[in-house]
């Protein structure tokens, strides 16, 4: 059992090292897209399933409340957080539409959709991205593996932050770290002296 624990830590560290080399440009571009949207008076919608839903909610909470320093609230909505809306849509046998309907209702041109999917193939996330495209929103996609169907939907203004791993647990760990990086970059760009 102890060896298995060491393997988990070693894999996580190796994934972090690979991501630290491969992802800074994409993470920076994602943060810039979000900052520009916020400066223009827009908002960030975010969604995910399972652990990705937790990461989406963590991002929205960090925007609305704060990340590490006190600062004004920033507009972000976790589309997976409203159980009544989710179950109402799903109850009508529209499971794949649980996020897309919300994007169509709430999303506006200039908003950002933070779409989090470990494999990039979750149908409800794919549909949300398709809806965001029709609303002229920018997409920041957190993926893993080969990026899945999600990667093929992104345009030149969109950003894919693809974790260099084929292990779901490692990808999800790195998605949380990436969300924290995005929050840190947004805060330090919009409120550069708040952490002093």
Curated annotation (Swiss-Prot):
Listed GO biological process terms: carbohydrate derivative metabolic process; DNA replication
Keyword Endoplasmic reticulum carried by entry: no
InterPro entries with a match to the protein in the record: DiaA, GmhA/DiaA, SIS_dom, SIS_dom_sf, SIS_GmhA/DiaA_subfam
Cited Gene3D superfamilies: Glucose-6-phosphate isomerase like protein, domain 1
Molecular function GO labels: carbohydrate derivative binding
Domain SIS: 34-196
CDD domains (alphabetical): SIS_GmhA
Keywords on record: DNA replication
Signal peptide: none
Family: Belongs to the SIS family. DiaA subfamily.
Summary of subunit composition and partner proteins: Homotetramer; dimer of dimers.
Function: Required for the timely initiation of chromosomal replication via direct interactions with the DnaA initiator protein.
Name this protein carries in UniProt: DnaA initiator-associating protein DiaA
């Amino acid at each position: 059992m102890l060896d298995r624990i060491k393997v988990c830590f070693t894999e996580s560290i190796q994934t972090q090292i690979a991501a630290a080399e491969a992802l800074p440009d994409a993470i920076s571009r994602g943060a810039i897209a979000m900052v520009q949207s916020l400066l223009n008076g827009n908002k960030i919608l975010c969604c995910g399933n399972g652990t990705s839903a937790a990461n989406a909610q963590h991002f929205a909470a960090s925007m609305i409340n704060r990340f590490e320093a006190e600062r004004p609230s920033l507009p972000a909505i976790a589309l997976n957080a409203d159980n009544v809306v989710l179950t109402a849509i799903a109850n009508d046998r529209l499971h794949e539409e649980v996020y897309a309907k919300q994007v169509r209702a709430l999303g506006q041109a200039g908003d950002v959709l933070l779409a989090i999917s470990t494999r990039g193939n979750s149908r409800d996330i794919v549909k949300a991205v398709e809806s965001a495209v029709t609303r002229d929103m920018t997409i920041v996609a957190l993926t893993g593996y080969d990026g899945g169907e999600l990667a093929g939907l992104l345009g030149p203004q969109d950003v894919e932050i693809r974790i260099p791993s084929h292990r779901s647990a490692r990808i999800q760990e790195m998605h949380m770290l990436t969300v924290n990086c995005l929050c840190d970059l947004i805060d330090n760009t919009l409120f550069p002296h708040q952490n002093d």
